[in-house]
UniProtKB/Swiss-Prot annotation:
GO terms for cellular component: cytosol. Pfam families: AA_kinase, PUA. Its main location: cytoplasm. Catalyzes the transfer of a phosphate group to glutamate to form L-glutamate 5-phosphate. It comes from Rhodopseudomonas palustris (strain BisB18). It catalyses: L-glutamate + ATP = L-glutamyl 5-phosphate + ADP. Signal peptide: none annotated. The gene is proB. Belongs to the glutamate 5-kinase family. GO terms for biological process: L-proline biosynthetic process. This is Glutamate 5-kinase. The keyword Metal-binding does not apply. Keywords: Amino-acid biosynthesis, ATP-binding, Cytoplasm, Kinase, Nucleotide-binding, Proline biosynthesis, Transferase.
Length: 376
């Protein structure tokens, strides 16, 4: 199958691992390599692309800054090292992107931020606003509070969740290997790179190997798990070597990599999930003008809501009905039931005075809204 071109994607998540970013001997960032990557990101940014970075390295940097001895760290030691390293990592990304006139915004997430709908919406809104302001979000797992029981444990899967959350259409995993091979390349000189994977099958998963072979496959098992998450959500993914300077430029120029393709797109996949997988917790009845606006692709504003029924929290799914009570669609609501009832019928600027907080302008954002009745 024909491999896509980087220039055809509008929102790209780039995952950078510790081994690429940090010199293991010196315990410091590989400055020249990072400068080259930042130049690649700036090039994409200049041409109107949204770029998000998922960056490892906080624990490794913290160890270096604290001059900790080599060897395994206890959980609380890792968390304390991450606290120091996160400050250093944020400053480094801010400086290298700032050299190109690009602002960077640090976002630290935990597993719950992508699993709980309320927190998911908060994180998604923050990312969306940074991108609207043409900043580059730099995202990492919050290692200072994550525990063994509630954490991603690897940034491949975190990057896939971030891509899903941000409705990215491409996820790039920069690795120490240039893609998926049909056999371990270190042990088999005849191993062949697989340029395109149209579907993650059992055969593809077998090529990635089990946990015991991760070192010889470049941690490929978690990358395949990331591919499953991303492609299910409508996001294409690719694995490419980050060991070279200007790795994104190399991809754009047709360099070696493995593409994982999906027939869906992020918005349709997300809306399919809203329509088919979530049990509605309440109902919003809207006026005729709001019905017309929604059918024209607009978001649902508080002013168009005439009745609120049910007990729902922010982030829950609700049914949207017209004045004749026919179902218009379903969506994820930005307010809980009590607040939605208080602001219904009011213009968005009134929300601050009614609730005492600066709330969302929309009751349901159009990206969180699926039009049409869902069969029972």
């Amino acid at each position: 199958m024909h491999r896509p071109e980087l220039k055809n994607f509008r929102r790209i998540v780039v995952k950078v691992g510790s081994s690429l970013l940090i010199d293991s001997e010196a315990g410091e960032v590989k400055a020249a390599w990072l400068a080259a990557l930042a130049a690649d990101i700036a090039e994409l940014h200049l041409h109107g692309r949204d770029v998000l970075i998922v960056s490892s390295g906080s624990i490794a940097l913290g160890r270096s800054r604290l001059k900790l001895a080599r060897g395994p760290l206890k959980l609380e030691e890792s968390q304390a090292a991450a606290a120091v390293g996160q400050i250093a990592l944020a400053r480094i990304w801010s400086e290298v992107l700032g050299d190109h006139g690009i602002g960077a915004g640090q976002i630290l997430v935990t597993l719950q931020d992508t699993e709980e709908r309320r927190r998911y919406l908060n994180a998604r809104s923050t990312i969306g606003k940074l991108l609207e302001w043409r900043a580059v979000p730099v995202i990492n797992e919050n290692d200072t509070v994550a525990t063994a029981e509630i954490r991603y444990g690897d940034n491949d899967r975190l990057a896939a969740r971030v891509a899903t959350m941000s409705s990215a259409d491409l996820l790039i995993l920069l690795s120490d290997i240039d893609g998926l091979y049909d056999a371990p390349p270190g042990a088999n000189p005849d191993a062949k790179l697989i340029p395109v994977v149209e579907q993650v099958t059992a055969e593809i998963e077998a090529m990635a190997g089990g946990a015991e072979s991760e070192l010889s496959r470049g941690g490929m098992r978690t990358k395949i798990e990331a591919a499953k998450i991303a492609t299910t959500a409508g996001t294409h993914m690719l694995i490419a070597s980050g060991k070279i300077d200007h790795p994104l430029r190399a991809i754009a120029n047709g360099g070696a990599c493995t593409w994982f393709l999906t027939p869906a797109n992020p918005v349709t996949a997300r809306k399919r999930w809203i329509a088919g997988s979530l049990e509605p917790k309440g109902t919003l009845t809207i006026d005729a003008g709001a019905v017309t606006a929604l059918r024209a692709g607009k978001s649902l504003l508080p002013a168009g809501v005439i009745r609120v029924d049910g007990h729902f929290a922010r982030g829950d799914a609700v049914v949207v009905r017209g004045p004749d009570t026919d179902e218009i669609g379903r969506g994820l609501v930005a307010y809980d039931a009590d607040d939605a009832d208080r602001i219904k019928g009011h213009s968005s600027p009134d929300v601050m005075s009614i609730l005492g907080i600066t709330g969302r302008a929309e009751m349901i954002h159009r990206d969180d809204l699926v039009m049409g009745a869902v069969p029972g």
